């Protein structure tokens, strides 16, 4: 497995990703790689980038959605909307990507179980092969931390976040996703 991520690699020109893949090819690192993933942000990926990714052998996308609620996305500083995500997802499918992960988050400011329910309904309808669900970790000196400190934002309490997690787990399992790691759920064969 090769994973190009740890941020938003889709923000840079695809030619740089192409160069990375060429170097890996030179070192024979691609010979045994069955899965080559790149993280993409719906606000920074284009149809041209997706075409390039597919052409150079990337066969899995991890799309950082986080929530289908545009107000929550704005609150956490995301540059995309749910509609941007849908466009990216459809473009990826049209380019032949048959293995897509969607990242969701729980424990976001002002998030409720009803928000999680709505996100899960919309995402499971799309039938991605993989869904990752992460809890928000508030980092020091970030805009979210500053707004929490002055009372402009509120995080769900621990019990609500725990209930969100169990709700997600149950809904995804009912929709045919196998829970194989703490934050990861996949259709059979995509673990």
What are these language model-derived features?
Residues 1-191:
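C-terminal scaffold of the Radical SAM
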């Amino acid at each position: 497995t090769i994973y190009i991520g740890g941020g938003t690699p889709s923000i840079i020109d695809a030619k740089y990703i192409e160069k990375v893949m060429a170097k890996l090819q030179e070192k024979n690192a691609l010979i045994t790689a069955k899965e080559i993933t790149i993280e993409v942000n719906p606000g920074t990926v284009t149809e041209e980038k997706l075409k390039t990714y597919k052409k150079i052998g990337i066969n899995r996308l991890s799309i950082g959605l986080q929530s289908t609620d545009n107000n929550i996305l704005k609150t956490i500083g995301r540059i995309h909307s749910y509609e941007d995500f849908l466009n990216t997802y459809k473009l990826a499918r049209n380019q032949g990507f048959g293995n897509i992960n969607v990242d969701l988050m729980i424990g976001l400011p002002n998030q409720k179980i009803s928000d999680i329910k709505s996100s899960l309904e919309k995402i499971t309808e799309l039938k991605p092969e993989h869904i990752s669900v992460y809890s928000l970790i508030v980092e020091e000196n970030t805009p979210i931390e500053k707004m929490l400190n002055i009372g402009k934002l509120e995080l769900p309490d621990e019990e609500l976040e725990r209930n969100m997690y169990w709700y997600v787990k149950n809904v995804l399992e009912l929709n045919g996703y196998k829970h194989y790691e703490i934050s990861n759920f996949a259709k059979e064969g995509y673990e």
